[in-house]
Amino acid sequence: MRIGILGGTFDPIHYGHIRPAMEVKASLKLDKILLMPNHIPPHKNTTHSSTAQRLEMVAQVCEALTGFELCDIEAKRDSPSYTVVTLKQLSRLYPDDELFFIMGMDSFIHLQSWHKWQQLFELANIVVCQRPGWHLAEGHPMQHELNVRHATLEALSHSSAPQHGRIFTVDISPQDISSTQIRSLLAMGEIPQDALLPVTLNYIQKQRLYFS
């Protein structure tokens, strides 16, 4: 089974997370995608809703969408959400499956700053979502990794046994949505209906999240 993994703060989860995940799922013919809320993101000091509330929002999205599942292993962890630790745990949970860790190009270009980043390739494939405006500069350290590890979608269709260590690039539709924008709109009393799944908007309104 091919399993995609998309981690994030999801504060709140919105179409800017979901639509690219759907496009990756379709492009790589993934069987399912795990949506994985962070508990203590290493690069962020705080969140605007509780871990329990973010878990519930993601759980409701997964109930509404086919092929998406909540993964709460990072949310249950008391230590920072380092990806290498998470992938080791997921490799034990899914020993016979092929893991695809999904990230944006904006994250990929900083991958060398991640904790034990080189071990990621021993545990999973990396899927880089290409967005307008982000390009690797000539001579960028990650350009070498991309050159060596890049795999085509055609190669994926011919592989049967689970593999890891490959980098797939997937062109995604531009998403002009961010959690920060959504929180700002809600704080001003505006309802960003086009940015959120109905179940998420309903939960936010019931819980009075992000409203000033």
UniProtKB/Swiss-Prot annotation:
Metabolic or biological pathway, per its Swiss-Prot or TrEMBL entry: Cofactor biosynthesis; NAD(+) biosynthesis; deamido-NAD(+) from nicotinate D-ribonucleotide: step 1/1
This protein's record includes keyword Lipid metabolism: no
Catalysed transformations (reactions): nicotinate beta-D-ribonucleotide + ATP + H(+) = deamido-NAD(+) + diphosphate
Database matches in SUPFAM superfamilies: Nucleotidylyl transferase (SSF52374)
Record-stated family: Belongs to the NadD family.
GO annotation terms (biological process): NAD biosynthetic process
The EC number(s) this enzyme carries: 2.7.7.18
Name of protein: Probable nicotinate-nucleotide adenylyltransferase
Top-rank taxon: Bacteria
Biological role: Catalyzes the reversible adenylation of nicotinate mononucleotide (NaMN) to nicotinic acid adenine dinucleotide (NaAD).
Keywords (A to Z) from UniProt: ATP-binding, NAD, Nucleotide-binding, Nucleotidyltransferase, Pyridine nucleotide biosynthesis, Transferase
GO MF, any single term: ATP binding
